[in-house]
């Protein structure tokens, strides 16, 4: 054919095709006039306007197909363009153009425009299904939201009415209470009897309204009567025992099933804070400080401190304000005030016992850096244990804080007037009522002195003598002698001169009672003035002069004299009971209080020390004996004394309460005390007080009124000798002084020095210092190990306290420590200073240690040389002698030089020196600890040597065998054996679908970074896998994919880049062994551009597409938030910066693992959010669309909204607009508490996806992590252009498990239909398949035939595998391999058989067998696979359609209706050009329209799907099958192209009428109109 004829033929073909296209597409076909470069009109450019077709919604996706035909078309491919797309992504257009271009090449030589248009139409219909389901869900969501808003408005109205009603009721109740209060006030002002007043008091107490129960967020742990730990959360009020203007005290019992708790009673203090100030920021800040104080106090447990078990701060349920609950230990006995109200005064021995308890409690508080601040009679409570009664301190610290807070801003109207605790004249000089917050430990000592006065003279004494001058002049001279000195010392005006609690405990009047007291003269407070309980009492001197058995002589055998000191001797003894050897120090107690205090201070110090290098202390006691003349006089009278009275005093650990600790207390409680009895009635208690120590001569007149002067009367004058026995650990008769004279080997010297240093570090950590450290006080045991002893000058380091407790009172800068000094050669220079106010601390021991080390290094020929050289080195210049055996670079020189610095601040502490490199490593058994220290410091010279040895170990085979021991233990859902085979197959499917989405966005795969230096961004409790390389570098495996990529971006120059990564992240195995690997998929966009909102939006769009791609995630939603918004919320909640990491970790579990209530409790338990703002957390617990969520935030913050929150909201608004333009398929919510890895995404947008079908399971998380990138950006490599990264991370395991549950669900539905292979039929393309085809044989093996067939299948790209051994039956093969997703089994016949040229094919899906010729197997399988793909595509389309119709279907009883949809098309139904998908979509659309109306018909119905416009549908309503004229008018009014179509419709209706059908549904799939057409 020549060129002219060819062109003529092409023109004819084009004209015919254009005419056909105009008939098919009608108005949607348009011829365009396009001018070329030479301004000539090209008349062969056509445009077809295509849109998606949907039966139940408008056309959403639209696209114009523009075709430019060349002269040689169809032999030359036309120019194809896609324009004017609506709701179609650019990526989809590019994809479609590739499809059209490929199809056009395949159809060269044929008419192709209709085929190309059909392809575009098909894809538009597919996209329509996705978009229509999205829009439908949005519309339904809007309807649900509107309904929810209406319901919420109704609830709000009801709540508002209820609040108004409650407010009115409360106002009336308040008025009624005021009326009752006024009546009671008037009744008290009128004269009436005391019994009447008591009755009114009871009525007032009962007026307090008690809640039914109080719930504590934190569990409360207490020990029951069996010393078992039991817990509870709720308490039930029993009775209000006290109601003051400040607080209410209520007896409560725990609500618990524990039998041991049934009789337990606790004290609940309730403080109501209702004035407006406490709702302001300043008020909340003060309340928050109170919480910190209570948090520190509730952990204190001591036998002489009443415990604070728990506290809770709640908002008032009505109105504004707070309610504070403090649960405390309760005593069913008296307070000290109640006791003194009953018995007026106490005898001196009882005062001593109670004073000892009070001082031990104060000493413990002061050791913790806490001042009581509110020590008075009501805060000393009495407890009963066995036959003894002892005193405890309660309400320490926080009650004074409450009073001060109330004084500055009253808690409520009634709390404006609070009674002062002390008279104005008796306040400590350093404070007043308004400034008591500045109270220190010395203020507590002042209050203790007043307590002693009240115990000795009665509670009223401070009211009668209301100034210090009156007390000093008229009261103190009448006290017993030693108590005069005690009270005077406590009431020193200069707080620096007051003793500490430890000093007072060491005084003989407290520790020894009246054992060494002289008799005193009778004063004003005489025996006759006291109430008598239990008969006539004997005097103190009578009690002391009775005969007793010596404990020392009874229990010990004295073996050897060890040494003698100024006040006594030390002997070696053998215990007659256990047979062990001990050292006993015997000290004669003199009348000098100061010397006795020094002796007792050593005992007190030893009692609190327990260390391997400190001399162990066991016990101490005092024994007294009289001179012969006195004994003889008293022996006759002593018969009347109680024979059970024992004067031995046991000084054990001060923090415990031994059985015989309070042996001198003579208060006996008879039977059980009824706690509900009236405490003001003396007759209500059965208590007898025996004043066994009362003397007829209790007081002494002191001629000298000076406070500082203490009376002293010698014991010898009264014929009384007192000896203190101290039982200690026995050390061999050897000290460092004995061996230091000889040359000590260097290794031995350092060993001894380290032990001394460890002992010092221990006593310094206990808040004490030795102050008399010298070789003679450093003893050596039989193994030549150090034992530090002789604590005669040791003292409490009153500077020691917890620096972390900011609320605790700091020690006054003017407080003095003891001024005693040790041996002159070893004592620190600051101790020798005579200047007043010179302060020192534990560094004085370090100076002494330096002298000792110097002496250990040197060898002296004479004592004078020793003194001269040590005196020289003690100079400020630290002049070492020329004979010093070590160089200046040696450890010895450096340590001594730093220890002998005259400036204490330049000396190291004991712990610092112990941890420094200056101390040579230990040897022998102690090397392990030293090795750990060296490994932790890479700068030591031994570090690399240790690593070399560490990495040079010989591998252990047993560790190799057990390394993977726990690897098979799965933590996920997979439990069946068959599921485990599915894991990898399904994971590959899921991974491929996710990667397809990422590649659609132009992402390329990047390399993973498997090992990098350990990062500080992870918490210690996170199970990251840490490793150590041979160079000692600490490394880690990836814990996630975010941090390694951020580190890589920071270190490399990166332009705009989209990447994805599929990599393992690792978790440390709990029991050791191989780390657990978790597959993670991430998608990240890196850029230097400033269009951050677009990249954030694109990342979220990619997330949305992944959720759409995986069918198990269709019921998911996307949550967005901004880190700056969450940070502003944490500021609003007053969460401190150091607690935000843990707080955000807990907040991230809201509505996933934990409810809001559980999150609140967790935050409360961890003390992360103050109670004053914890209730405000609910304000931000919402999940709304962006506009509503932003509006809520603006209402909450108002004009005080932080600027960074405003900026973040504006940024989020831009991102949301872009997402709506991108038309994401899933619901987008704004959730202010949405957070995951806050430290990573700080300063940027954060987003998550959660699966609502799986209890809000977190699917993935992501956000912008620019700050993390900057964290890893090396300072020297930073550029002006910032690097921005945003990304998302999926845990592949979660996606696989989600799909697995989805498959199981569909399997369970399909199994009821008895499908032969429900697994594959129900899930379609998501069925995991290892291969499609399995080649096998029956009986004798035919390996060569199988190989030939297998090679042919592989050549056709068919996935196939072989079973090498022949099977016994085909059913055996099918059963064995069905779980692997195989569809076809091919059975190869053996040679020389009748069927050797054919193959038996079993279709497992259909359970059908076919015989296929051997040479046709490949093509047959290709056809079968293509058919399966079409069926799976149909199944997937039907599932999407069913999902969109589920809301309609639930209202229609489809089981009772049989709808037959028949299509009337423009062309013959069997015409191949009218594709099946067109027919199916049209019929499905009509089916949906009929569903909403099918309820009106109870009979089977027929629906006709027609392609008519609205005008034609309207005219159809006026026609009937019996009226031919109406049809003629209808047909004539239609366009020529539609008339034939309408005639065919008429014939169809007549045919149905002849079949006796009554009615038919006529549905237009063009206009979505439906009409029930009557046929009769």
Swiss-Prot record:
Q: Name one GO molecular function term.
A: ATP binding
For this UniProt entry, which residues form the secretion signal? none
Q: According to the UniProt entry, which residue ranges have a biased composition of type Basic and acidic residues?
A: 695-706
Q: How is its activity regulated?
A: The integrated stress response (ISR) is activated in response to conditions that promote ribosome collisions: gcn1, which acts as a ribosome collision sensor, activates gcn2. The RQC pathway and the integrated stress response (ISR) antagonize each other: hel2 prevents the activation of gcn2, while gcn2 suppresses RQC activation. Ribosome stalling-induced integrated stress response prefers ribosomes with empty A sites. The kinase activity is stimulated upon binding to uncharged tRNAs.
Enumerate the subcellular locations listed in this protein's record, separating them with semicolons.
Cytoplasm
E.C. numbers: 2.7.11.1
One Pfam family here: RWD
Q: Which family does it belong to?
A: Belongs to the protein kinase superfamily. Ser/Thr protein kinase family. GCN2 subfamily.
Subunit comment: Homodimer; homodimerization is important for kinase activation by uncharged tRNAs. Interacts (via N-terminal RWD domain) with gcn1 (via N- and C-terminus); this interaction stimulates gcn2 kinase activity in a gcn20-dependent manner in response to amino acid starvation.
List the PANTHER family: EUKARYOTIC TRANSLATION INITIATION FACTOR 2-ALPHA KINASE EIF2-ALPHA KINASE -RELATED
Q: What is this protein called?
A: eIF-2-alpha kinase GCN2
> Organism, per UniProt?
Schizosaccharomyces pombe (strain 972 / ATCC 24843)
């Amino acid at each position: 054919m020549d060129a002219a004829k060819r062109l003529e033929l092409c023109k004819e073909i084009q004209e015919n095709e254009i005419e056909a296209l105009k008939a098919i597409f009608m108005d949607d076909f348009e011829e365009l006039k396009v001018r070329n470069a030479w301004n000539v009109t090209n008349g062969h450019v056509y445009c077809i306007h295509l849109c998606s077709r949907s039966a139940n919604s408008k056309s959403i996706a639209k696209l114009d197909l523009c075709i430019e035909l060349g002269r040689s078309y169809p032999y030359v491919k036309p120019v194809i363009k896609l324009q004017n797309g609506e709701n179609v992504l650019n990526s989809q257009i590019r994809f479609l153009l590739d499809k059209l271009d490929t199809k056009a090449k395949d159809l060269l030589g044929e008419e192709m425009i209709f085929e190309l248009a059909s392809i575009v139409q098909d894809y538009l219909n597919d996209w329509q299904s996705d978009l229509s389901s999205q829009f439908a869900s949005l519309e339904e969501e809007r309807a649900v939201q509107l309904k929810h808003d209406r319901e919420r408005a109704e609830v709000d109205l009801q709540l508002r009415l209820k609040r108004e009603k409650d407010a009115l009721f409360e106002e009336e109740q308040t008025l009624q209470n005021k009326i009752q209060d006024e009546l009671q006030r008037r009744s008290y002002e009128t004269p009436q009897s005391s019994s009447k007043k008591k009755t009114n008091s009871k009525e007032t107490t009962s007026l307090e309204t008690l809640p039914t129960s109080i719930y504590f967020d934190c569990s409360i742990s207490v020990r029951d009567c069996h010393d078992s730990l039991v817990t509870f959360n709720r308490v039930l009020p029993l009775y209000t025992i006290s109601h003051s203007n400040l607080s209410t005290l209520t007896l409560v019992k725990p609500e618990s099933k524990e039998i041991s708790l049934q009789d337990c009673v606790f004290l609940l203090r309730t403080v109501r804070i209702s004035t407006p100030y406490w709702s302001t920021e300043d008020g909340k800040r003060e309340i928050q400080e109170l919480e910190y104080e209570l948090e520190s106090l509730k952990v204190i447990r001591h036998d002489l401190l009443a415990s604070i078990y728990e506290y809770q701060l709640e908002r008032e349920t009505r109105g504004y304000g707070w309610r504070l609950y403090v649960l405390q230990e309760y005593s069913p006995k008296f307070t000290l005030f109640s006791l003194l109200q009953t018995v007026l005064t106490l005898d001196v021995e009882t005062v001593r016992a109670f004073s000892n308890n009070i001082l031990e409690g104060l000493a413990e508080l002061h050791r913790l850096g806490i001042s009581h601040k509110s020590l008075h009679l009501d805060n000393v409570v009495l407890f009963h244990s066995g036959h003894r009664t002892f005193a405890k301190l309660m309400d320490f610290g926080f009650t004074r804080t409450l009073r001060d807070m109330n004084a500055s801003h009253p808690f409520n109207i009634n709390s404006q007037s609070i009674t002062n605790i002390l008279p104005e004249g008796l306040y400590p000089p350093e404070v007043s009522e308004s400034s008591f917050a500045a109270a220190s430990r010395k203020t507590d000592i002042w209050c203790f002195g007043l307590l002693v006065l009240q115990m000795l003279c009665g509670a009223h004494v401070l009211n009668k003598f209301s100034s210090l001058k009156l007390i000093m002049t008229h009261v103190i001279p009448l006290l017993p002698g030693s108590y005069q000195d005690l009270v005077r010392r406590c009431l020193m005006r200069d707080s620096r001169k007051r003793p500490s609690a430890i000093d007072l405990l060491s005084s003989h009047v407290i520790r020894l009672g009246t054992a060494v007291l002289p008799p005193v003269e009778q004063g004003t407070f005489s025996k006759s003035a006291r109430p008598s309980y239990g008969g006539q009492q004997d005097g103190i001197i009578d009690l002391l002069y009775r005969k007793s058995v010596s404990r020392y002589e009874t229990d010990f055998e004295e073996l050897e004299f060890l040494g003698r000191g100024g006040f006594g001797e030390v002997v070696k003894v053998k215990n007659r009971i256990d047979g062990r050897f001990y050292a006993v120090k015997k000290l004669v107690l003199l009348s000098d209080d100061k010397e006795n205090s020094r002796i007792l201070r050593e005992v007190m110090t030893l009692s609190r020390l327990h260390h391997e290098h400190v001399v162990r202390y066991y016990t101490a006691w005092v024994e007294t004996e009289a001179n012969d003349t006195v004994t003889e006089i008293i022996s006759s009278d002593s018969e009347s004394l109680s024979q059970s009275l024992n004067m031995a005093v046991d000084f054990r650990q001060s923090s415990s309460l031994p059985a015989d600790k309070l042996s001198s207390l003579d208060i006996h409680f008879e039977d059980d005390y009824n706690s509900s009895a009236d405490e003001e009635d003396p007759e209500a208690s059965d208590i007898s007080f025996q004043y066994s120590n009362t003397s007829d001569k209790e007081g002494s007149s002191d001629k000298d009124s000076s406070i500082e002067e203490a009376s002293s009367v010698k014991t010898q004058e009264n014929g009384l000798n007192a000896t203190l026995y101290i039982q200690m650990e026995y050390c061999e008769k050897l000290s460092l002084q004995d061996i230091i004279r000889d040359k000590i080997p260097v290794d031995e010297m350092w060993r001894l020095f380290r032990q001394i240093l460890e002992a010092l570090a221990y006593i310094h950590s206990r808040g004490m210092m030795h102050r008399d450290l010298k070789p003679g006080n450093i003893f050596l045991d039989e193994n030549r190990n150090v034992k530090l002893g002789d604590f005669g000058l040791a003292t409490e380091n009153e500077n020691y306290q917890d620096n972390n407790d900011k609320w605790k009172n700091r020690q006054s800068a003017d407080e003095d420590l003891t001024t005693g000094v040790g041996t002159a050669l070893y004592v620190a220079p600051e101790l020798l200073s005579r200047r007043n106010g010179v302060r020192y601390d534990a560094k004085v021991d370090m100076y002494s240690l330096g002298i000792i080390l110097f002496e250990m290094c040197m060898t002296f020929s004479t004592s004078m040389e020793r003194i001269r050289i040590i005196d020289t080195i003690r100079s400020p210049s630290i002049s070492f002698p020329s004979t010093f055996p070590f160089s200046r670079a040696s450890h010895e020189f450096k340590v001594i030089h730093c220890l002998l610095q005259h400036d204490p601040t330049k000396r190291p502490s004991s712990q610092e020196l112990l941890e420094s490199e200056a101390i040579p490593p230990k040897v022998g058994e102690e090397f392990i600890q030293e090795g750990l220290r060296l490994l932790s410091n890479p700068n030591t010279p031994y570090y690399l040597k240790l690593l070399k040895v560490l990495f040079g170990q010989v591998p252990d085979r047993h560790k190799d065998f057990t390394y993977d021991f726990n690897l098979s233990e799965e933590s996920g859902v997979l439990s069946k054996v068959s599921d485990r085979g599915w894991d990898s197959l399904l994971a590959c499917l899921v991974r491929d679908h996710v990667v397809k989405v990422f590649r659609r966005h132009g992402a390329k795969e990047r390399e993973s970074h498997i090992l990098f230096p350990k990062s500080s961004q992870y918490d210690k409790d996170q199970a990251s896998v840490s490793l150590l390389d041979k160079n000692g570098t600490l490394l880690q495996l990836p814990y996630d994919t975010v941090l390694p990529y951020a580190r890589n971006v920071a270190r490399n120059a990166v332009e705009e880049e989209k990447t994805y990564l599929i990599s393992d992240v690792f978790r440390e195995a709990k029991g050791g062994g191989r780390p657990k690997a978790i597959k993670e998929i991430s998608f990240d966009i890196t850029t230097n551009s400033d269009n951050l909102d677009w990249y954030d939006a694109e990342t979220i769009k990619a997330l949305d597409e992944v959720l759409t791609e995986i069918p198990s995630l269709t019921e998911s939603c996307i949550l967005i938030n901004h880190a700056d918004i969450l940070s502003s919320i944490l500021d609003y909640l007053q969460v401190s910066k150091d607690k935000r990491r843990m707080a955000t970790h807990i907040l991230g579990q809201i509505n996933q693992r934990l409810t809001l209530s559980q999150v609140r409790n967790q935050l409360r338990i961890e003390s992360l959010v103050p109670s004053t703002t914890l209730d405000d957390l609910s304000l931000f617990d919402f999940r709304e669309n962006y506009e509503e969520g932003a509006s809520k935030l603006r209402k909450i913050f108002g004009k005080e909204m932080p600027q960074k929150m405003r900026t973040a909201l504006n940024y989020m608004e831009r991102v949301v607009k872009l997402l709506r333009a991108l038309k994401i398929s899933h619901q987008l919510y704004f959730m202010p508490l949405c957070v995951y890895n806050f430290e990573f995404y700080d300063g940027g947008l954060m987003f998550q996806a959660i699966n609502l079908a799986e209890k809000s399971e977190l699917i993935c998380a992501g956000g912008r992590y620019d700050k993390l990138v900057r964290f890893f950006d090396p300072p020297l490599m930073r550029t002006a252009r910032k690097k921005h990264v945003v990304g998302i991370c999926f845990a592949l395991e979660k996606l696989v498990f989600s799909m697995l549950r989805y498959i199981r669900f569909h399997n369970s539905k399909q199994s009821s239909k008895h499908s032969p292979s429900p697994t594959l039929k129900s899930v379609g393309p998501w069925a995991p398949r290892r291969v499609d085809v399995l080649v096998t044989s029956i009986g004798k093996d035919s390996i060569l035939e199988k190989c030939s067939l297998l090679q042919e299948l592989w050549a056709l790209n068919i996935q196939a595998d072989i079973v090498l051994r022949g099977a016994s039956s085909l059913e055996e093969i099918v059963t064995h391999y069905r779980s692997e997703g195989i569809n076809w089994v091919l059975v190869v016949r053996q040679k020389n058989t009748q069927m050797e040229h054919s193959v038996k094919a079993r279709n497992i899906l259909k359970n059908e067998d076919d015989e296929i010729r051997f040479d046709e197997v490949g093509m047959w399988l290709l056809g079968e696979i293509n058919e399966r793909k079409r069926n799976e595509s149909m199944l997937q389309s039907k599932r999407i359609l069913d999902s969109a119709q589920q809301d309609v279907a639930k209202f229609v009883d489809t089981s009772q209706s049989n709808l037959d949809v028949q299509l009337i098309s423009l062309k013959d139904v069997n015409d191949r050009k009218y594709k099946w998908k067109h027919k199916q979509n049209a019929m499905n659309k009509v089916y949906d329209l009929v569903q909403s109306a099918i309820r009106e018909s109870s009979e089977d119905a027929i629906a006709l799907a027609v392609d008519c416009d609205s005008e034609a549908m309207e005219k159809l309503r006026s026609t009937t099958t019996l009226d031919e004229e109406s049809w003629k008018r209808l047909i004539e009014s239609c366009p020529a192209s539609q008339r034939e179509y309408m005639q065919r419709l008429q014939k169809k209706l007549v045919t149905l009428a002849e079949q006796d059908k009554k009615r038919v549904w006529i549905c237009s799939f063009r206009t979505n109109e439906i009409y029930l057409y009557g046929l009769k």
